[in-house]
Amino acid sequence: MSSSRMPALFLGHGSPMNVLEDNVYTRAWRQLGETLPRPKAIVVVSAHWFTRGTGVTAMEAPKTIHDFGGFPQALYDTHYPAPGSPELAQRLVDLLAPVPVALDKEAWGFDHGSWGVLIKMYPDADIPMVQLSIDSTKPAAWHMEMGRKLASLRDEGIMLIASGNVVHNLRTVRWHGENTPYPWATAFNDYVKDNLTWQGPAERHPLVNYLDHDGGSLSNPTPGHFLPLLYVLGAWDGQEVITIPVDGIEMGSLSMLSVQVG
């Protein structure tokens, strides 16, 4: 990575409780914020904004969205008042054309997939941010292509952060007691790591075709938490180093794998 090029990050965000906790994952996020070059702005792709069509937050002051239930009041009292950037939102509209991108000026904001990790990386909430939605109607290869289109922003001092979980099966989560990962969850998590640097046509990429893996559908009964990874891999130039800042599987079937490009 050149000295001026921003990295691209995929962060396994896990439970909202990570906002309140100090653990190996939150410490890794904090270290990223302390050691990586400070971005001029951030584009976030979160698993929690899954839409028909593509949208981008375009307000001056996006709200903090508490898109979860049954957690301690302290979580609902926590806000992340990072400024928005209507200018950057318009830049994405132009950059992603001919894909139509709707400018969202009031409906959304920063959900816990975005602010839940950024509050650890940049606790002062002073870096302008926009959040890009994930179009639920498009195939996996399309999302990787979106990452390729976003890659040029990295040379403008803008960091791309995608947030999800490459293993995300809440039906099999061990909510209490036993925390040992299921063998299929470990196998799929390893499969992801083994294929991060695969090169070739997007439609043939093993991670675009993740459902072909024996544990793919069990690890991801729905695609929303897996697809953010493809934006970051799409922004890879094929030569940059790809590293893993932190890894682990919590509650049996929730991968906390994070991936850094550059």
Please give the residue ranges for each predicted region:
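Flexible, glycine/proline-enriched loop segments at strand-loop-helix junctions
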Residues: 75-83, 105, 133-140, 216
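Short glycine-enriched loops at secondary-structure junctions
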Residues: 47-51, 62, 109-118, 166
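A short aromatic-anchored loop/beta-hairpin motif
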Residues: 2-103
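Solvent-exposed alpha-helices and their adjacent loops that cap or buttress functional pockets
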Residues: 2-3, 35-36, 121-125, 152
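Short, basic/glycine-rich phosphate-binding loops at helix/coil junctions
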Residues: 9-10, 67-72, 122-130, 207-208
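Surface-exposed, charge/polar-rich loops and edge strands
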Residues: 94, 98, 127-128, 136-138, ...
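Internal, conserved structured core segments that host functional sites
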Residues: 89-144, 149
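Beta-strand elements within well-structured catalytic alpha/beta cores of enzymes
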Residues: 7-11, 41-46, 132, 153-166, ...
